[in-house]
Amino acid sequence: MRYLLVAFGLLAGAAHAEGGADPDWPCIQRKQPHLSLGQMWTGPEPDDAARALARTPDIAALADRLEQRRLPIATAEAEIAEYAKSADNQHLTALMLAIFDRVEPHRVALMEGIARYGHKQVDLAARIEDHRHRMATLEAATPPDFDAIDAQEQKLDWDMRIFQDRQQALTYVCETPVILEQRVFALGRA
């Protein structure tokens, strides 16, 4: 039964990884390594003045607050609407640029971490397969060394548990870049 679970887990992981065009990308979602402001914002293209405004303390502080995921999107939209009452288009563009400039580097680092996570899963799957081969060799020996078989089985069980826990966490991990994209897009529409 354990071998069946191992085989299923390895096949599911391999099929899961084949979903995207990038072999290093373990997520179902298509890998979009970098976003552009134009994908998220339909307003005017930021010029040098907007870039300078984006670095001002008031806009930077507001962007720092709005980009935080713990702030409900409805609250963030209300704060943008309140800010828009007294701000011109240049300031709104600067605010969007400041938000984007905070989220995008975080998102890129997160995606690089996901790729490393995927590599660790592949390495762990190879280690599990190695445990299986060692167990088969130990079980085929005459006479079988039951202590060695038990030790190998414990290693296999432990690695399988880690592998399965990571596979379950992968769904959430893969959703995080999408959540960040959706937040930036929603704030750009506000």
Where are these regions (language model features)?
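Sec-dependent signal peptide recognition
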Residues: 1-7
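Extended, amphipathic alpha-helical coiled-coil scaffold segments used for oligomerization/tethering
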Residues: 93-104, 122-160, 164
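Hydrophobic h-region of N-terminal signal peptides that target proteins for export
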Residues: 8-17
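Long amphipathic alpha-helices with heptad-repeat character
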Residues: 73, 114-117, 121-131, 163, ...
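Alpha-helical oligomerization segments
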Residues: 147-190
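Structured catalytic/translocation cores of nucleotide/phosphate-coupled proteins
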Residues: 17-18, 190
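N-terminal Sec/ER secretory leader and immediately downstream segment
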Residues: 18-88
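Short, charge-rich amphipathic alpha-helices with coiled-coil/heptad character
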Residues: 83-112
